[in-house]
């Protein structure tokens, strides 16, 4: 027993070589002295170190010592195989086991979660194990349900999850906190928030993890006010929970600025604002709401800042059009000897794409190459977009061709790059090449339609739109209709553009109407142009450009009085510091 105690202690204190030496020492002791607990400790060690050879050595040693038939040790060995993802060996061991208890089955079920492959395939395998359990005398416990419900959550298998819920109730586990937490996550992901709340209410002794599961479910389903209300209910619970970093991070990820400031006040009161994950969530919330000064104040107040915190600031400024400030923050981050990761590089490159910064892009690319981050798709895709938006198509193409396995974002980026530089036919050729490997999405089709519009490829654009809606069953959105209207309008097919405009499933947006009036203006279709301009004025009566479109139509027909009346109406409804028809030059030498 003394050796067993020392052996277990050394697992936590010594290095790997010392552990293996201890294993050799165990093997020199007669089998009668080798207790199952000692061998169990070595099994845990090997599993945690991911060494298959060590696990197999233990396996052989157990057989040699005649203790292989111990169910306790077999379960430990099975757990070791699953932890190092040697599932073939785990399956073989399982088939050889003469006895199995619920621990054995639970190891297999939770091992399925770690397996590679499609989530539906993993769920199917897990339910095969469940079917076999139900034909034995073994009873499922809360650990079994947690694993099985997790498989349903990952695959969004609603029917199977509901059946598990029924089985859980039948076995009297509906008030158990642990499987109920898994059920709340499952129902939340499936959008059945009423069921999630019902499961939550059935648990009498709730822990904070269960509360957090319901909060995140509300957030996931866009029910921010309800999630915020749960924070108040926590304090009235018998355990008087006040939330933790997960609670506040979930709420901050989706709340409005007013609610975010309330949470900030609570965090200050309970001294959570210095916690790195919570402080980072605060930064994100303020940045998303374009409250960059508040975000900076939070950032400056952080005692410890990690790469994630810096990334949040860089992303926040980049997304709000403050590209130069994002670059400055990146430089400051490097001065503090923090190593940027792939998200940092991708964010910085995205910020460079929003202002003329070709030199900065090249500097970042050199750093990316030096640090070996060029293989990350997010970084490579950002390089394509950055070079394209800064007018360097050749570099964008070089970046694309350097990617070993381009994903859909890579292909879409290069298709858009070619289209925006006037290479419409090459853009379509790239699209056809992509179709041999990947299935397009709505963004890909939007880039292709844009290429057709800029290149005047009417028939190709119509075929593309038809392929999207009929073959790929992708529902056209406002942007797709706008591109199609723009394509037809530019080419002079005003009646066809009008038909598309009127066939939209929703009311035409201002973008679609502007594209239509633009085409009418090019081809001098004044009546259609006036109709579109009047529609624009109905939607946006305070936008000066809409008055200009209609006014120009009146002037082109010689209706000066109507144009003058329209300009008076514009001055009454809009604040426009400029005088229409006049250009202004500032004299800054005074």
UniProtKB/Swiss-Prot annotation:
Transit peptide: 1-109
UniProt entry tagged with the keyword Transcription regulation: no
Locations listed in the record: Mitochondrion
Single biological process term from Gene Ontology: mitochondrial RNA processing
Pfam assignment, any one: E_motif
One GO CC term, this protein: mitochondrion
Coiled-coil annotated spans: none
UniProt keywords, alphabetically: Mitochondrion, Repeat, Transit peptide
Native species: Arabidopsis thaliana
Listed name of the protein: Pentatricopeptide repeat-containing protein At2g46050, mitochondrial
Similarity field: Belongs to the PPR family. PCMP-E subfamily.
GO molecular function annotation: RNA binding
NCBIfam families given in the database record: PPR (TIGR00756)
Spans annotated as Type E motif: 512-588
Keyword Transmembrane on entry: no
Ranges: PPR repeats: 141-175, 176-206, 207-241, 244-266, 275-305, 306-340, 341-375, 376-406, 407-437, 441-471, 477-507
């Amino acid at each position: 027993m003394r050796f067993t105690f020392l052996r277990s202690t050394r697992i936590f204190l010594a290095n790997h070589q010392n552990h293996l030496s201890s294993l050799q020492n165990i093997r020199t002791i007669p089998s009668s002295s080798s207790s199952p607990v000692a061998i169990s400790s070595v099994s845990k060690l090997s599993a945690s170190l991911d060494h298959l050879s060590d696990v197999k050595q233990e396996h052989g040693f157990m057989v040699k010592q005649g203790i292989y038939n111990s169910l306790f040790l077999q379960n430990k060995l099975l757990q070791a195989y699953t932890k190092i993802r040697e599932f073939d060996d785990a399956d073989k061991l399982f088939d050889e086991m003469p006895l199995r208890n619920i621990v054995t089955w639970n190891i297999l079920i939770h091992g399925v979660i770690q397996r590679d492959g499609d989530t539906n395939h993993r769920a199917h395998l897990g339910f095969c194990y469940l079917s076999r359990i139900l034909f034995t005398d073994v009873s499922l416990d809360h650990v079994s349900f947690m694993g099985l419900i997790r498989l349903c959550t990952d695959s969004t298998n609603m029917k199977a999850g509901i059946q598990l819920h029924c089985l859980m109730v039948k076995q009297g586990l509906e008030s158990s906190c642990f499987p109920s937490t898994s059920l709340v996550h499952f129902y939340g992901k499936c959008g059945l928030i009423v069921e999630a709340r019902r499961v939550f209410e059935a648990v009498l002794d709730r822990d904070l993890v269960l509360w957090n599961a319901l909060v995140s479910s509300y957030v996931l389903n866009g029910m921010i006010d309800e999630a915020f209300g749960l924070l108040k209910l926590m304090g009235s619970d018998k355990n008087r929970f006040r939330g933790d970093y997960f609670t506040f991070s979930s709420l901050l990820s989706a709340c409005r600025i007013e609610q975010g400031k309330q949470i900030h006040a609570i965090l200050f009161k309970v001294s959570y604002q210095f916690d790195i994950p919570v402080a980072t969530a605060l930064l994100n919330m303020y940045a998303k709401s374009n409250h960059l000064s508040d975000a900076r104040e939070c950032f400056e107040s952080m005692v410890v800042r990690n790469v994630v915190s810096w990334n949040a600031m860089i992303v926040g400024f980049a997304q709000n059009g403050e590209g130069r400030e994002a670059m400055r923050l990146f430089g400051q981050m490097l001065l503090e000897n923090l190593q940027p990761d792939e998200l940092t590089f991708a964010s910085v490159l995205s910020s460079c794409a929003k202002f003329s910064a070709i030199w900065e892009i090249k500097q970042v690319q050199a750093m990316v190459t030096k640090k070996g981050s060029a293989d990350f798709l997010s970084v490579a895709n950002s390089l394509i977009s950055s070079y394209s938006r800064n007018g360097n198509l050749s570099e964008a193409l070089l970046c694309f061709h350097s990617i070993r396995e381009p994903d859909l974002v890579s292909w879409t980026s290069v298709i858009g790059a070619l289209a925006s530089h006037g290479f419409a036919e090459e853009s379509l050729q790239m699209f056809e090449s992509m179709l041999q490997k990947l299935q397009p999405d709505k963004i890909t089709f939007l880039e292709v339609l844009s290429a057709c519009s800029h290149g005047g490829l009417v028939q190709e654009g119509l075929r593309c739109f038809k392929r999207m809606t009929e073959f790929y069953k992708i529902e056209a959105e406002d942007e797709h209709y706008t591109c199609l209207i723009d394509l037809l309008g530019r080419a002079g097919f005003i009646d066809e553009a009008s038909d598309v405009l009127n066939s939209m499933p929703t009311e035409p947006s201002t973008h679609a109407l502007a594209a239509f009036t633009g085409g009418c203006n090019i081809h001098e279709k004044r009546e259609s142009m006036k109709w579109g301009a009047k529609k624009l004025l109905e939607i946006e009566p305070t936008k000066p450009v809409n008055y200009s479109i209609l006014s120009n139509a009146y002037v082109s027909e010689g209706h000066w009085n109507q144009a003058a009346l329209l300009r008076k109406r514009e001055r009454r409804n809009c604040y426009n510091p400029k005088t229409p028809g006049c250009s202004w030059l500032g004299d800054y030498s005074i």
